[in-house]
């Protein structure tokens, strides 16, 4: 290869790298709203939910004003948290998470399912001190209903919401740990077939187990959309437990009568990369009647 051709190749590579870095910075500081419609005969009246996951202390604008504005424009009946609103980091501030949730809780009912980062705060007080207790006190003070292997029934709408917190071994890297068929039942009990059952379950890898347990709708996160998504193909590249091209990376999945909406999350941690993979807020319309599903995107 001649010197002139080599210069051309180097220039092309440099331009590609600059473009990729620009896209990464752009995608790391924006989010889209994805809108889903789900119907079921057991739902008694329409309910609009916003689903937030994996914020990891990220701020969209001053005091998260862009995120708050987007949620206000949706005008939800409730907000469902699918875990990891904060990042488990020694001596980290709780301010970003608590400030956002305080502003939201003043307007909307919030049901909060833990992710592995909230769980980690409780497991390792030697590393995180009293962060778990302070966070719990803050959420109780502003009236957030935390669902830690518990459930709440919305009688008027015919909906039952469960929040699961599974053992840390199910978050191990480099593989998926087998889960006993009775494990979820031992944590959560048995769901009622008369209610439309929503399960907030941070880790999507166990979707088949959630379906077997009896969930009608699973709300998950954790994977961050695979961090980098392959253009055109749209597949996420790597999961937090270091598996390439994870099966469950983001979007809607169906298994039998069970659907899972897997949020691509809003923030980042450890490896702060989002490429072709902006943050995501889910807008979910739960409607009475027959089967219907759909989705749309709106950038923010």
Predicted segments — roles?
Residues 57, 85-88, 116-120, 167-169, ...:
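Solvent-exposed loop/turn segments at secondary-structure junctions
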Residues 51-53, 79-84, 109-116, 147-150, ...:
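Active-site neighborhood of phospho(di)ester-bond hydrolases with catalytic His/Asp-centered motifs
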Residues 46-56, 158-168, 198-201, 259-264:
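Active-site-proximal beta-strand elements of phosphoester/diester hydrolases
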Residues 39-50, 144, 151-161, 192-193, ...:
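Beta-strand-turn-beta hairpins that frame and shape the catalytic cleft
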Residues 122-142, 151, 156-197, 207-208, ...:
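Binuclear metal-dependent hydrolase catalytic cores centered on His/Asp/Glu-rich metal-binding motifs
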Residues 1-43:
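N-terminal membrane-anchoring alpha-helices
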Residues 203-282, 290:
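Conserved beta-sheet core of the metallophosphoesterase superfamily
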Residues 45, 50-145:
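Membrane-embedded segments
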């Amino acid at each position: 290869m001649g010197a002139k051709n080599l210069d051309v190749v180097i220039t092309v590579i440099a331009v590609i790298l600059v473009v990729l870095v620009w896209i990464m910075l752009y995608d790391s500081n924006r989010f889209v709203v994805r809108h889903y419609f789900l119907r079921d005969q057991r739902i008694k009246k329409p309910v609009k939910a916003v689903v937030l996951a994996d914020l990891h202390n990220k701020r969209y604008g001053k005091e998260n004003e862009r995120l708050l504005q987007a949620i206000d424009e949706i005008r939800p009946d409730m907000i469902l948290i699918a875990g990891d609103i904060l990042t488990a980091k020694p001596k980290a501030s709780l301010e970003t998470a608590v400030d956002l949730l305080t502003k939201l809780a003043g307007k909307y009912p919030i049901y909060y399912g833990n992710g592995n980062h909230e769980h980690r705060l409780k497991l390792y007080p030697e590393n995180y001190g009293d962060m778990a207790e302070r966070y719990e006190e803050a959420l109780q003070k502003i009236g957030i209903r935390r669902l830690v292997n518990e459930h709440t029934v919305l009688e008027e709408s015919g909906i039952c919401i469960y929040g699961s917190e599974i053992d840390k071994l199910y978050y191990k890297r480099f593989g998926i740990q087998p889960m006993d068929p009775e494990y979820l039942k031992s944590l959560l009990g048995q769901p009622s077939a008369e209610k439309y059952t929503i399960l907030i379950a941070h880790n999507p890898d166990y979707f088949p187990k959630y379906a077997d347990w009896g969930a009608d709708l699973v709300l998950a996160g954790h994977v961050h959309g695979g961090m980098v998504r392959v253009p055109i193909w749209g597949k996420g590249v790597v999961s937090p437990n270091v598996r390439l091209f994870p099966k469950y990376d983001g979007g809607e999945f169906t298994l039998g009568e069970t659907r899972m909406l897997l949020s691509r999350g809003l923030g980042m941690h450890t490896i702060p990369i989002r490429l072709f993979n902006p943050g995501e807020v889910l807008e979910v319309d739960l409607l009475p009647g027959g089967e219907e599903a759909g989705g749309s995107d709106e950038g923010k």
